[in-house]
């Protein structure tokens, strides 16, 4: 018999490789830059777990599908702005309680693998949540 509360799930989408327009220099805005995006999100998966029901789970393919057009088609001067817009899209999934987005721009500086910005978002907790 289960004697603990379960159901808070953490989904991690690690090192999603994408190309997007990022930067302030003219050549940076003419050519897409290599980006690596990692997402961690938490949601209450108790119903999905107990019913083994994919329809009430967070579909991580839908999460990625929501992010791709933003990265591939929009232009950003700052990694911070791109990260915020990505976070907004993840938090648009109403069952997501908490999310962390890490956006890395590969080879942005000499002698580095990448430069990264990480942002987090959290929904306010209702009086009933633990």
Language model region names:
Residues 1-130:
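N-terminal, polar/charged subdomain of small-to-medium soluble alpha/beta proteins
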